[in-house]
């Protein structure tokens, strides 16, 4: 019965390749460096996200009218959301050994963004790309091709779980011009 339910939920969606033990170790090691300056890195990620994809700001009334990256950087609301994003990633990284915990955290994120905030799920894919871009720029010395591959697999898994939550709640795409 559980297998049938899982098949229904994942129908039409290819599950990403699972992380190996080595890849989980790589992610945990590099994340320790990133998380040491999590607020600054998180702010950099969100600023890049909003500058390159200004349509994403529509979901944030507190700073949707901000155009200047310096103004965004000073926004306490943006900093608060950056901490939330980084803390969610931290929870995932800390629990890579426990796929059920990772899934439950990401399903909560997905459901909240679908129900409460009405965020188009494509923004999670876009944000994943921005995260990878910033990590490579800010931590280039340790962001080898092997590290990039590990993080890319993690971002694919995050997106898969989050969009799975959207599917689970019966998300209907709002418009094709949102992005």
UniProtKB/Swiss-Prot annotation:
Assembly notes: Monomeric.
| Annotated catalysed reactions | Fe(II)-heme b-[protein] + nitric oxide + O2 = Fe(III)-heme b-[protein] + nitrate; Fe(III)-heme b-[protein] + nitric oxide + H2O = Fe(II)-heme b-[protein] + nitrite + 2 H(+); 2 superoxide + 2 H(+) = H2O2 + O2; H2O2 + AH2 = A + 2 H2O
Task: State where heme b binds.
Answer: 81, 113
Q: SUPFAM superfamilies given for it?
A: Globin-like (SSF46458)
The role this protein plays is: Probable multifunctional globin with a hexacoordinated heme iron required for the catalysis of various reactions depending on redox condition of the cell as well as oxygen availability. Has a nitric oxide dioxygenase (NOD) activity and is most probably involved in cell-mediated and oxygen-dependent nitric oxide consumption. Under normoxic conditions functions as a nitric oxide dioxygenase (NOD) but under hypoxic conditions the globin may switch its function to that of a nitrite (NO2) reductase (NiR), generating nitric oxide.
Which keywords has UniProt assigned to this entry?
A: Cytoplasm, Heme, Iron, Metal-binding, Nucleus, Oxidoreductase
Q: What is this protein called?
A: Cytoglobin-2
Provide the free-text tissue specificity comment from this protein's UniProt record. Answer: Expressed in all tissues examined, with highest levels in brain and eye, and considerably lower levels in skin, gut, heart, gill, liver and muscle.
Instruction: Identify the domain of life.
Output: Eukaryota
Q: Which gene encodes it?
A: cygb2
The main location is cytoplasm
GO CC term (a single one): cytoplasm
**What's the family?**
Belongs to the globin family.
What biological-process GO terms show up in the record? nitric oxide catabolic process; oxygen transport; removal of superoxide radicals
Q: Where does the secretion signal sit in this chain?
A: none
Write out the annotated subcellular location.
Cytoplasm; Nucleus
**What Pfam families does the database record attribute to this sequence?**
Globin
Entry's Gene3D superfamilies?
Globins
């Amino acid at each position: 019965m559980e297998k049938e339910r899982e098949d229904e939920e994942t129908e039409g969606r290819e599950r990403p390749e699972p992380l190996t033990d080595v890849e989980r170790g790589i992610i945990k090691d590099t994340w320790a460096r990133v998380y040491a300056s999590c607020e600054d890195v998180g702010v950099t990620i969100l600023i890049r996200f909003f500058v390159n994809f200004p349509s994403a700001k529509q979901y944030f009334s507190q700073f949707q009218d901000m155009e200047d990256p310096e103004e965004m950087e000073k926004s306490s609301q943006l900093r608060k959301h950056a901490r939330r994003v980084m803390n969610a990633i931290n929870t995932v990284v800390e629990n890579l050994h426990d796929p059920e915990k990772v899934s439950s955290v990401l399903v909560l994120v997905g459901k909240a963004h679908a129900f409460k905030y009405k965020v188009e799920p494509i923004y999670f894919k876009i944000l994943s790309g921005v995260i990878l871009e910033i990590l490579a720029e800010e931590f280039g010395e340790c962001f080898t091709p092997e590290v990039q591959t590990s993080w890319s697999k993690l971002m694919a898994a995050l997106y898969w779980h989050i969009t799975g939550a959207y599917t689970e709640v019966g998300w209907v795409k709002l418009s094709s011009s949102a992005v």
